[in-house]
């Protein structure tokens, strides 16, 4: 999860988030190299008193700086498209959970089970126990099995919302009348926090998301106790 004065991304917990972090580093390296080269050329031209006759009109140079940026953009676009297809692909999900956004809480329905559904509200600050996180704790966590592909069906009952869990690389819009889907998969157990990422009204900041990723056996015991 995030911590105060954090400069980097949250620790990756899913394969998608690992790919996104690698792509971020890949793109940042390209941007750094281009920026360094441009700044070096600008400083060189500003500090030297010599002027090359072909600096202002050189067909070869213009050809190079047309082809080179195109090649760089392709190097950025190809891994980006690959990740987009990975995020959209859902093959044989082990579990399907329907998520509905409301003003200002989330409701969840485990479609593979009968009568396994609940609402998830933020716990007010005055009701927090020692060690719990302000504005992030909920009364009902979403318990899911780890190391399995899980399909989330996301929509909204009223206005636009966005279901986002940064450490899992998830951010999917909840749109009234439309059903979006996302894949959830965690490499390790733990609690993973998120929030609504679309301004949805006065209490937009008060609809957190808490995923509890657990081993399959623990999930089976939990689901049996909830039915």
Swiss-Prot record:
Cofactor binding notes: Binds a dinuclear copper A center per subunit.
GO molecular function per UniProt: copper ion binding; cytochrome-c oxidase activity
EC class (word): translocase
A matching Pfam family: COX2_TM
Amino acids binding Cu cation A2: 196, 198, 200, 204
Binding positions for Cu cation A1 per the UniProt entry: 161, 196, 200, 207
SUPFAM superfamilies assigned to the protein according to its UniProt record, in alphabetical order: Cupredoxins, Cytochrome c oxidase subunit II-like, transmembrane region
TM stretches of this protein: 15-45, 60-87
Topological domains annotated Mitochondrial matrix: 46-59
Positions where Phosphotyrosine occurs in the chain: 218
InterPro entries, per the entry: CcO_II, CcO_II-like_C, CcO_II_C, Copper_CuA, Cupredoxin, Cyt_c_oxidase_su2, Cyt_c_oxidase_su2_TM_dom, Cyt_c_oxidase_su2_TM_sf
Biological processes, Gene Ontology terms: ATP synthesis coupled electron transport
Membrane topology: Multi-pass membrane protein
Entry's localization field: Mitochondrion inner membrane
Keywords: Copper, Electron transport, Magnesium, Membrane, Metal-binding, Mitochondrion, Mitochondrion inner membrane, Phosphoprotein, Respiratory chain, Translocase, Transmembrane, Transmembrane helix, Transport
Catalytic activity line of the entry: 4 Fe(II)-[cytochrome c] + O2 + 8 H(+)(in) = 4 Fe(III)-[cytochrome c] + 2 H2O + 4 H(+)(out)
Gene3D superfamilies listed in its UniProt record: 1.10.287.90, Cupredoxins - blue copper proteins
PANTHER family membership: CYTOCHROME C OXIDASE SUBUNIT 2 (PTHR22888:SF9), CYTOCHROME C OXIDASE, SUBUNIT II (PTHR22888)
Family note: Belongs to the cytochrome c oxidase subunit 2 family.
NCBIfam families: CoxB
Function: Component of the cytochrome c oxidase, the last enzyme in the mitochondrial electron transport chain which drives oxidative phosphorylation. The respiratory chain contains 3 multisubunit complexes succinate dehydrogenase (complex II, CII), ubiquinol-cytochrome c oxidoreductase (cytochrome b-c1 complex, complex III, CIII) and cytochrome c oxidase (complex IV, CIV), that cooperate to transfer electrons derived from NADH and succinate to molecular oxygen, creating an electrochemical gradient over the inner membrane that drives transmembrane transport and the ATP synthase.
Quaternary state and interactors: Component of the cytochrome c oxidase (complex IV, CIV), a multisubunit enzyme composed of 14 subunits. The complex is composed of a catalytic core of 3 subunits MT-CO1, MT-CO2 and MT-CO3, encoded in the mitochondrial DNA, and 11 supernumerary subunits COX4I, COX5A, COX5B, COX6A, COX6B, COX6C, COX7A, COX7B, COX7C, COX8 and NDUFA4, which are encoded in the nuclear genome.
Protein name per Swiss-Prot or TrEMBL: Cytochrome c oxidase subunit 2
Upper classification of the organism: Eukaryota, Metazoa, Chordata, Craniata, Vertebrata
């Amino acid at each position: 999860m995030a911590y105060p004065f954090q400069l980097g991304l949250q620790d990756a917990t899913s394969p998608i988030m690992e790919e996104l972090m690698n792509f971020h580093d890949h793109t940042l390296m390209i941007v750094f190299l281009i920026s360094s080269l441009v700044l070096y050329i600008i400083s060189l031209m500003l500090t030297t008193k010599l002027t090359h006759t072909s600096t202002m009109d050189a067909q070869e140079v213009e050809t190079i700086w047309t082809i080179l940026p195109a090649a760089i953009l392709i190097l950025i676009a190809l891994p980006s498209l690959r990740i987009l297809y990975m995020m959209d692909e859902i093959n044989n999900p082990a579990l399907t959970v329907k998520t509905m956004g409301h003003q200002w809480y989330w409701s969840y329905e485990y479609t593979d089970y009968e009568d396994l559904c609940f609402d998830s509200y933020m716990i007010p600050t005055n009701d927090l126990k020692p060690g719990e996180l302000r504005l992030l704790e909920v009364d009902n966590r979403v318990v899911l099995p780890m190391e399995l592909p899980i399909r989330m069906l996301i929509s909204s009952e009223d206005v636009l919302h966005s279901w986002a869990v940064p450490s899992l690389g998830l951010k999917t819009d909840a749109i009234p009348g439309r059903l979006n889907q996302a894949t959830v998969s965690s490499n390790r157990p733990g609690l993973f926090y998120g929030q609504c990422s679309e301004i949805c009204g006065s209490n937009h900041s008060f609809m957190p998301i808490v995923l509890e990723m657990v081993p399959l056996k623990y999930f089976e015991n939990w689901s049996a106790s909830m039915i």
